[in-house]
Amino acid sequence: MSSGIRTDLALESRELNPDIEGVEEQTEERERMTVSRIKITDRTAAKKLDKPIGKYVTLDAPELCNRPLDLFEQMSAALSEELRDMFTGLKDDATVLVVGLGNRSITSDSLGPRVAERIYVTRHVTEYMPDALPGTVRSVCSVAPGVLGVTGIETMEIVRGVKEYAKPDMIIAIDALASRRAARINTTIQLTDTGISPGSGIGNNRKGLNSEVFGVPVIAIGVPLVVHAATITQEVISLIADKTGLHGDEEKLKRLAEQVISENLGQMVVTPKDIDSIVEDMSGIIATGINMALFGKSYEDVRMLIA
């Protein structure tokens, strides 16, 4: 990495290290979004990119910041499509556990819990009233385990307990992420088959939620909702350099800015003032995409289910 500023996005890690071998890339340009697929194939690349071996898909739609409702539908449909591609071998009657990571009381960290409460849960029906269902329906349950500072219990301990009781065939985890670019807030969704570490968005890594730990496939979905203060400063320096044409000391100034901010403000992270509406929008997009993927429903049908 060229900077000490961390990113949770594999796409950004790759942008910083474009020449590393052991990485397969594919970019698909759609009408209003870009779909980037990255596959890290060996340990050397994983170490250099600071990301586990596996698949990473990024949906990027800059227009989302304007909140166009028709683009919400397109993003949900695209997310659903990519999720189904990761449902390899998942049976129609499988049990799926959706885990909403984060702190419901802190808006910028509440994405996971807000998605979890919008999931169309069916496990109780398949368990106790199966005749009430029209044919084969996946058994879906969701949980928002909270955070260590509120519950006093490691998030993964709670999830492990739920997993042992519900016995899911797959886990889908949702969490807020951190980006190196402020412009990615509210415009980007990443999904990966490598799992996630709660708190990774602010560098507060807890025990990981992944297939190695839980013994079942774990898909993680995240949205950048915070950026480091040093990131914004560096972006401003780049903009000034572009406007003035003075690029000579740009990298030196960026490193100095990062050092000054770190010494005086610590690892400060910031989020937009309209984060409430951003989280509301993104949680709806993600929950709808998950429900569409799990139940094979249309966008309109799913929106009625979770309204």
Predicted ranges, named:
Residues 103-138, 142:
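Glycine-rich phosphate/diphosphate-binding loop of Rossmann-like nucleotide-binding domains
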Residues 44-92:
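An N-terminal, well-structured beta->alpha segment
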Residues 101-109, 149, 176-180:
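Gly/Ser/Thr-rich loops at beta-strand to alpha-helix junctions
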Residues 143-144, 173-307:
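A structural signal for small-residue-enriched, beta-sheet-centric alpha/beta enzyme cores
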Residues 133-163:
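A structural-propensity feature for long, helix-poor, extended segments
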Residues 163, 168-169:
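Proline-aspartate-enriched helix->loop->beta-strand connector
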Residues 1-53:
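N-terminal amphipathic/basic leader segments beginning at the initiator methionine
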Residues 58-62, 95-106, 141-146:
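Short glycine-rich or small-residue beta-strand-to-loop segments that form or flank ligand, phosphate
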